Amino acid sequence: MKTAFKALVVGAIVGALGSACAPTQQAGGAGSASGEPDLSGSIVIDGSSTVFPISEAVAEEFQKLYPNVRVTVGISGTGGGFKKFLNKETDISDASRPIKPSEQELADKNGITYVELPVAFDGLSVLVNPQNDWVDHLTVDELKKIWEPGSTVKRWSDVRPNWPNEEIKLYGPGHDSGTFDYFTEAINGEEGAARSDFMASEDDNVLVTGIAGDKYALGFFGFAYYEENKDKLKLVPIDGGSGPIAPSAQTIMDGTYAPLSRPIFIYVRSDVMARPEIKEFIRFYMTEAKNLVREVGYVPLSDELYELALKRFEEGVTGSIFAGGGSQIGVRLEDLLKAES
């Protein structure tokens, strides 16, 4: 797939939502905690390890309000999550990239429609071991040189001659990961195109442990997992053409951390949207996400974008705002949502 024009481990959930926020809905919301104390049922969520902390945090707080609703949140990667979702094994799918054309074809074949809802922004973070004292930044071209298919880079000195003549140990998400898809699209110019000789895992904690335990390691994953483990890792600023920039809440939100800033999503199957527990859960998700997203280390959308996303759900607007085209680099979520509304 050609790149489009160029343009978060659950943290401790603060208990402030308890008596302060429940059960009264905030002004302008859709009434997620509006009263239905006898609401019951079950909701099954699976997919992205990146989105998992957000959905898990939302599920925990929702179940405090509605203890008779059982919400389970699993991890199988964005691609693995879509496989379950499109076979009707789950109600909601966590995704760290938009749905791919091949997945859209399966949805069409199985007669499945869905509503796509952005929930936060993330910045793919490039990490090294804290003992690494030679890397102060990497360029996009250097990342491509390291990660592209058929890469001949084996040692740090293959990237820059003055760097150590030591083997680079690479760590990254597996092929079912939306983070892997987005990174390869942004850096290598083709989704899924990468060298194969790296330690791959759908569990970001495995990647954290690997990089933290190896002086010569290099890897990437979502910003929240760096925030959760910043005492064990060293963040690498990336030069996308405007000088080295590190991911932060500000640079991710304003897009200056390019090309590795992205929106992340949940997908809801249309055929389950009428269930009362699903309706209330999604309304709660969209109205409370801003606070919970921050608590688990990601960057919230603006109030306007959460309102537009909730409107999308309430009106049952199906399909992807990315037209089923998968990862698209440099496309502004705000522009797409506003154009649709």
Where are these regions (language model features)?
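Flexible loop/hinge segments at secondary-structure junctions
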Residues: A22-S341
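C-terminal motif of bacterial Sec signal peptides marking the signal peptidase cleavage site
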Residues: L17-A20
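Bacterial N-terminal signal peptides that target proteins for export
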Residues: M1-V9
